[in-house]
Amino acid sequence: MISSEISYSVVVPVFNSSHSLVELRDRIDAVFKNEMKETYELIFIDDGSESELTWPFLNGLSKKYKEVTSIRLMRNFGKQGALLCGFSNAKGRYIITIDDDLQHFPEDIPSLAALNAHDVVIGRFENKEHNLSKRIFSRVNNWFETKLLGKPEHITNSPFKLIRAEVVNSFLQIKTPNPSLSALLFFVTKDVKNVSVRHAKRPYGKSGFTLKKMFETFASMLFNNSSFLLKLIAYAGISISFFSFLLALIYFIKKLTVGIPVPGYASLVTVTLFIGGLMLFSIGIVGEYLIRIINGVELKPAYVVREKSEG
């Protein structure tokens, strides 16, 4: 629900963090009150943190500062589910997503806000302070987002972004238990801009976004928001069937023109390839229908709230 009193909602997914949150809140507060002169709310989403310190810390922040709202999920639903929870509770005309580890500079928020006439403004990091595996994953993920999700080719995606409330309200109507924020965004709008922002080294602890979670995020995009693999199987089936048909035609022509006998194993291989290709093609077609049916009837929630604390 959009509130006329709040201009910006800042959504921060939190997992096992506490050391960085006071500094993050203070810097965000200074940006909005001293530089932008805008009203804001700060929404922390505790995504099932394993640390027993995280929720009491967030609860304390929301009791101390009227701009802060803290929400605790029942378990770890993943970053995408946590973001959707934050979006559902946001009241601002513009929603900003930022990580909890201080690698994103709150001081760059005005750069995003300067382009808020666009539906989505995404921070493009000038120099990434990620390790090699994260940088590789980011490049691969960006390529697939362009090819599978319709992300404009000139746009680089990142977690640091500004989204107009109208866009958020539109994709919140799409109910899916395995959400991909990128898939939802690029389905709703193509009015997306990049702006250069800074990227800092992580000052506290280690990232909770492990290789396993990277793979799970990528798999969710691939399986739940795209029929790419099914189409790949179908195309492979067609190609194999076509190849086996050509092979059979060649053997048949040789038999008629030259009189070369067709070996038994050759005809067996040809028939096997043809049948196998047809089976793969059929599975792809059936799977295409199946995934559409599942997407239509699956209504499991993307997150479940345990408790909420407001200032």
Language-model-detected regions and their locations in the chain:
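Solvent-exposed polar/charged
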Residues: 63, 88, 114-115, 138, ...
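Acceptor/aglycone-binding surface of glycosyltransferases and processive sugar-polymer synthases
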Residues: 73-75, 80-89, 94, 106-179, ...
